[in-house]
Amino acid sequence: MHNFLESEKAIHELEGKIIELINFADKNKVDLTYEIEILSQKLEQMQKEMYENLNPWSKVKLARLQERPTTLDYIEKLISGFTEFHGDRFYGDDTAIVGGIGLFEGIPVTVIGHQKGKDTKDNIRRNFGMPHPEGYRKALRLMKQAEKFKRPILTFIDTSGAYCGIGAEERGQGEAIAVNLIEMSKLKTPIIAIVIGEGGSGGALALGIGDRVCMLEHSIYSVISPEGLSTILWKDATLAQRAADMMQLTAQDLWSMKVIDQVIKEPLGGAHKNADLVADQIKTYVLQELKDLRMLKTEELLEKRYTKIRNIGIWK
């Protein structure tokens, strides 16, 4: 298969040509319908050939695209009256994780997710979506609040991993993640986790314990990045593509292993091509699952969640 980024560039160039023709036709009052149709058909064919045959490494690159919708994008489309909360009440706030309350189709919910930036400046402010311990403690504070007020919890996962700087380690990064895993496993309210981009290691898992876990079609979820694995195994980060092929990190792989419950389709070209469509599909999925989960008694909800967690990684 051609290099993913080269193919993506060719598609962008063709899209640009189509837009130019449309604008030229409008401005000069000429009929270019035939030419535009030919290019549109060519574009659709290129997209099908590219996106219907993606290898794992290409999916890694697609999951990392800066253009993909973020947690705040989905909150804007799915949650009305959203109010963001800040701070962990121990140390400070962490902009790599956003969280708050709002209404999902009239249902009061708590929403929490990793937040990457839209450009370089925003990424620096958001620490490229890599949370510090205070981010995970903020998330847990909101989850405990959701439990108290019996609000379902929605989490959006999109991080390359928890931040591994000295300050983060000194403030208890590992402990913060571990406590989230423990507490999320026994929260007395429904939890639905959605991987929307990168699901990197414990940094992703700290928001990923749920009664239902789903992934977007071109998202990834793994215990380590392909670059990290290739560096450990072969002392060579340039072998990341080989590592990705081995890791079974795609949504399809994880669904087949019963690690996740559902794969949500993305439009041709990825979620960034039609974020409204993806949001609608997330809405449909979450509505149905919340309907089922809210009918369960608390004891049954926790028992099913425990069984789900314990069954991950079991081979028969």
From Swiss-Prot:
Domain of life: Bacteria
Statement: the UniProt record of this protein carries the keyword Metal-binding: no
PROSITE patterns found in the cross-reference section: COA_CT_CTER
Alphabetized GO MF terms: acetyl-CoA carboxylase activity; ATP binding; carboxyl- or carbamoyltransferase activity
Pathway: Lipid metabolism; malonyl-CoA biosynthesis; malonyl-CoA from acetyl-CoA: step 1/1
Any one Gene Ontology BP term: malonyl-CoA biosynthetic process
InterPro entries documented for this protein: Acetyl_CoA_COase_a_su, ClpP/crotonase-like_dom_sf, COA_CT_C
Catalytic activity: N(6)-carboxybiotinyl-L-lysyl-[protein] + acetyl-CoA = N(6)-biotinyl-L-lysyl-[protein] + malonyl-CoA
Entry EC number(s): 2.1.3.15
Principal EC category: transferase
Keyword Plastid on entry: no
UniProt keyword list: ATP-binding, Cytoplasm, Fatty acid biosynthesis, Fatty acid metabolism, Lipid biosynthesis, Lipid metabolism, Nucleotide-binding, Transferase
Entry similarity comment: Belongs to the AccA family.
Subunit annotation: Acetyl-CoA carboxylase is a heterohexamer composed of biotin carboxyl carrier protein (AccB), biotin carboxylase (AccC) and two subunits each of ACCase subunit alpha (AccA) and ACCase subunit beta (AccD).
Function as written in the Swiss-Prot or TrEMBL entry: Component of the acetyl coenzyme A carboxylase (ACC) complex. First, biotin carboxylase catalyzes the carboxylation of biotin on its carrier protein (BCCP) and then the CO(2) group is transferred by the carboxyltransferase to acetyl-CoA to form malonyl-CoA.
Protein name: Acetyl-coenzyme A carboxylase carboxyl transferase subunit alpha
Organism name: Alkaliphilus oremlandii (strain OhILAs) (Clostridium oremlandii (strain OhILAs))
